[in-house]
């Protein structure tokens, strides 16, 4: 869904992407229709807290799909499907991949799609009722939110760090905590995302998820 002019997105020419137009007001009404209490959704930024509930909110749209997910709009993606296959995501029937709010993938099942509701009685910031009725951003999609609930749920997850978390305060491509790394990135239709690193005088090529 987008509130932008769909015609201008046709330049992407992506056969596996379907764009649907929906105003923010109509989206708010759609989200509200899924809950029996008055939600707080005054600005698009608050949607960060609702991302983990998309499997529940958009359950009609997701019928027929085995998995769903979300990611930030400034993420440069590698070959997601190849990555999941290489790490036996489907073979092991993992319920979720993800560590941070950059990108997460969920199995499309009723049990998994309701995990975000399981924080009642734990603490204030993990109770979805508190999260969805407050104007405050709870970073519910991050490590101190949905991650805690999935750890408690007992579902099997793919949890290793397969991404490069780039420090946006520097011009050069460095991860948080790195000092003067020597790294370049390239992307191609054939090979996806590739990082070229100079480590101890040797060139090391990696294929991060993002």
Regions found by a protein language model. Name each.
Residues 2-6:
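Conserved short acidic donor-positioning loop in nucleotide-sugar-dependent glycosyltransferases
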Residues 7-11, 28-29, 76-80, 85, ...:
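Short catalytic/ligand-binding loop motif for oxyanion handling, primarily in non-cytosolic enzymes
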Residues 8-63:
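Active-site-proximal specificity loops/subdomain of glycosyltransferases
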Residues 15, 71-73, 99-102:
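Residues that flank catalytic or metal-binding motifs in active/ligand-binding sites
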Residues 23-25, 107-111:
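Short loop segments at secondary-structure junctions
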Residues 50-93:
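GT-A fold catalytic core of metal-dependent nucleotide-sugar glycosyltransferases
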Residues 89-105:
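A short, conserved acidic/glycine-rich loop-to-beta-strand motif
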Residues 113-210:
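Catalytic core and acceptor-binding pocket of nucleotide-sugar-dependent glycosyltransferases
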């Amino acid at each position: 869904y987008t509130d932008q002019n769909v015609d201008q997105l046709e330049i992407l020419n992506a056969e596996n992407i379907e764009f649907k137009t929906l105003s923010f007001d109509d989206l708010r009404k759609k989200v509200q229709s899924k809950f029996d209490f008055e939600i707080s959704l005054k600005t698009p930024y608050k949607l960060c807290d609702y991302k983990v509930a998309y499997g529940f909110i958009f359950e009609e749209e997701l019928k027929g799909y085995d998995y769903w997910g979300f990611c930030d709009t400034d993420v440069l993606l590698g070959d997601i499907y190849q990555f999941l296959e290489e790490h036996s995501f489907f073979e092991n029937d993992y319920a979720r991949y993800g560590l941070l709010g950059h990108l997460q993938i969920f199995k499309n099942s009723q049990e998994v799609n309701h995990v975000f509701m399981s924080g009642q009685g734990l603490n204030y910031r993990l109770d979805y009722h508190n999260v969805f009725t407050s104007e405050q951003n709870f970073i519910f999609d991050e490590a101190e939110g949905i991650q805690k609930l999935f750890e408690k749920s007992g579902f099997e997850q793919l949890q290793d760090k397969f991404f490069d978390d780039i420090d946006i305060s520097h011009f050069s491509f460095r991860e948080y905590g790195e000092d003067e790394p020597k790294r370049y990135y390239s992307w191609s239709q054939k090979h996806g995302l590739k990082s070229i690193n100079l480590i101890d005088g040797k060139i090391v090529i990696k294929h991060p998820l993002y």
